[in-house]
Amino acid sequence: LSKGDFTHTPELYLADEAMMRGETAFTPRQLTDLNPWFAGMLSEPRELWMDTLDGESRVQGFVFPPQGMEEGKKYPAVVYIHGGPTPFIGAALTYEHQCILGAGMGLIVMNFRGSSGYGEAHQSMTRAYDGGAMTDILQFTDLAVRECPWMDGERLGVTGGSFGGYMTNWICGHTKRFKAAVTQRSIANELIQYASSDMAGSSKDYADFSDFMMEQLKKSPVSYAEKIDIPFLILHGMNDMRCPVEHAHQLFSAVRETHPDLPVKMILFPGMTHSFPMGGPIDLRIAHYDAMIGWFKKYL
């Protein structure tokens, strides 16, 4: 079997049949140790739980201190919102997270409502889009600041890709909690998703098509672009079929027009699809991470 965690790449282990059936203690023998060179280099997270404000669920999350943190020193932190929204943050090494941590910033991740792994009610897509996810993200962020003396609650950034990008856009248009943002392969206009995404939507639940159109605009972060007033970086692959690159163009134009003096930048990556930067040419992946980390280091 293969096993890894937040600070270890997957390694091969050998377990006998009795262990697998639960008849004896589960103590598999490790067969490989492929990356001993970074032992102790990576940041270990602290697990936190909270009851949601409405009392309907509990949210699990993890807070990572910066690599090489010095006692008594304050550090900025980045809230990283996962995509989906149905995936979840589990005990696996994520190099994107560790890149941020290696740049002198902390990291906050959580499994807000819409995430899988905590039952059907918690996973509800309705709760992901009706304000439940945003409330959970902000509440967990406040919890992390209270619980971590090293974290500077006035120097927080926010980022995410796909649904995480949508939520980054939405939060920045509805709160003043963060000092800088990086939105990745995001959704800005739900009408683009309806018409152009490879997961195109449908108006079949609406009796009046104009009502459907207006509802999509209400749910679209671009409609609230004038409320985005923090340094804002947009990263997007030009061949993204899930969240077409038109999202990036519309959001960039709207934020720049409504805030001419605001630091806002768009970087497009030729040929890259929705799986970028998890996959793709290494030079473009490095450029993506350099842009994201550089933005936060400059503005946090």
List each language-model region with its residue ranges.
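Short loop/turn segments at connectors of secondary-structure elements within structured domains
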Residues: F6-T9, E71-K73, S116, P260
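Short regulatory "switch" loops immediately downstream of catalytic or recognition motifs
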Residues: A15-M20, P66-Q67, A254-E257
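A short loop-to-beta-strand structural motif that recurs across blades of beta-propeller domains
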Residues: E11-Y13
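Cap/lid segment of the alpha/beta-hydrolase catalytic domain
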Residues: R21-E154, T159-G161, Q193-A200
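Short flexible coil/turn linkers enriched for glycine and charged/polar residues
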Residues: F6-T7, G55-S57, G165
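Active-site-proximal cap/loop segments of hydrolase catalytic domains
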Residues: F112-L300
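Glycine-rich His-Gly loop
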Residues: G4, Y80-G84, G237
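Beta-strand C-termini and the immediately following turn/loop, strongest in propeller blades
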Residues: L1-F6, D16-E17
